[in-house]
Swiss-Prot record:
Lineage: Bacteria, Bacillati, Bacillota, Bacilli, Bacillales
HAMAP family named in the record: THF_DHG_CYH
Protein name as it appears in the record: Bifunctional protein FolD
Subunit relationships: Homodimer.
UniProt GO cellular component terms: cytosol
Residues annotated to bind NADP(+): 165-167, 190, 231
SUPFAM superfamilies: Aminoacid dehydrogenase-like, N-terminal domain, NAD(P)-binding Rossmann-fold domains
Molecular function terms, GO-annotated: methenyltetrahydrofolate cyclohydrolase activity; methylenetetrahydrofolate dehydrogenase (NADP+) activity
Keyword Kinase carried by entry: no
Highest taxon listed in the record's lineage: Bacteria
InterPro entries: Aminoacid_DH-like_N_sf (IPR046346), NAD(P)-bd_dom_sf (IPR036291), THF_DH/CycHdrlase (IPR000672), THF_DH/CycHdrlase_cat_dom (IPR020630), THF_DH/CycHdrlase_CS (IPR020867), THF_DH/CycHdrlase_NAD-bd_dom (IPR020631)
NCBIfam families with a match to the protein in the record: PRK10792.1, PRK14186.1
Catalytic activity: (6R)-5,10-methylene-5,6,7,8-tetrahydrofolate + NADP(+) = (6R)-5,10-methenyltetrahydrofolate + NADPH; (6R)-5,10-methenyltetrahydrofolate + H2O = (6R)-10-formyltetrahydrofolate + H(+)
């Protein structure tokens, strides 16, 4: 049996086409969704991510604004900019590209963004709403992962989901989203003993640890859905995930590739959240 490849880029394109239609309808009502992205410093990876977000906005018809600051910006000045954007009716979503310089406290910056414009889903209020199953902006990568699993037509309810990784951005929230879908969730991390015994029980295995090709066929239950969140660059310059793709292909039922797996879904869910925020605000642009 060879696993079915879940092509995240194709799923993302399908969802972006739906978002484009929604944006057209909103614009007919005078509502233009707007996203502001704040970039601090000259980190090439951050700039590349921001470019992808701008391109996504342009594709679906969202107004986007890039606000750039030098690495020397003070925390106070950055907080003042967020306050300005919180009060700007043209902006439905505010995103601060992480990481930030060491002299700026990320927690203070994230908490300053209005929960109504927190399209990244990182604000403690958004996290609390997600934990309690309330309607909120879901974190983009975890939300994208759940959508990819749903593409397999597998009924998530009652399934055993194992998450390798416990970061605040992916590991912890993705487990909670599957719990909200009535799955049974197990977390594995660097201190977990007998990890393979646990992962072999997984109907759905999520891997987000940042270790190239860590997960091999002996981690996988036959027929499982395997979602590889890792993006690692090998010495050859080639990208690979946390899962040894070729090794696992004959055991898994479904698997995401790297690249063109989870990555395209992250920006797509950000666009989704921005459109949702515009719908909720319902502000007609003058």
């Amino acid at each position: 049996m060879v696993a079915v490849i879940i092509k995240g880029n194709e799923v993302a394109e399908k969802k972006r086409a739906q978002l484009t239609e929604e944006v057209v309808k909103l614009k007919e009502q005078g509502i233009v969704p707007g996203l502001a992205v704040i970039l601090v410093g000259e980190d090439p990876a951050s700039r590349s991510y921001v470019k992808g977000k701008e391109k996504g906005c342009e594709q679906v018809g969202i107004y986007s604004e890039l606000i750039e600051f030098p690495e020397t910006i003070t925390e106070e000045r950055l907080l003042a900019e967020i306050d300005r954007l919180n009060g700007d009716d043209r902006i439905n979503g505010i995103l601060v590209q992480l990481p930030l310089p060491k002299h700026i406290e990320e927690k203070a910056i994230i908490e300053r963004i209005s929960p109504e414009k927190d399209v990244d889903g990182f604000h403690p209020i958004s996290v609390g709403r997600m934990m309690t199953g309330q309607d909120t902006f879901l974190p983009c990568t975890p939300h994208g992962i759940v959508e990819l699993v749903k593409e397999t037509n597998l009924d998530i309810s009652g399934k055993h989901v194992v998450v390798i990784g416990r970061s605040n951005i992916v590991g912890k929230p993705v487990g909670q989203l599957f719990l909200n879908e009535n799955a049974t969730v197990t977390y594995c991390h660097s201190k977990t003993q007998n990890m393979k015994e646990l992962t072999k029980l997984a109907d759905i295995l999520i891997v987000a640890v940042g270790r190239p090709k860590m997960v091999t066929a002996d981690y996988i239950k036959e027929g499982a859905v395997v979602i590889d969140v890792g993006v690692n660059r090998l010495e050859t310059g080639k990208l690979c995930g946390d899962v040894d793709f070729d090794n696992v292909l004959d055991v898994a039922g479904y698997i995401t590739p790297v690249p063109k797996g989870v990555g395209p879904m992250t920006i797509t869910m950000l666009l989704h959240n921005t459109v949702e925020s515009a719908k909720r605000a319902g502000v007609v642009c003058k």
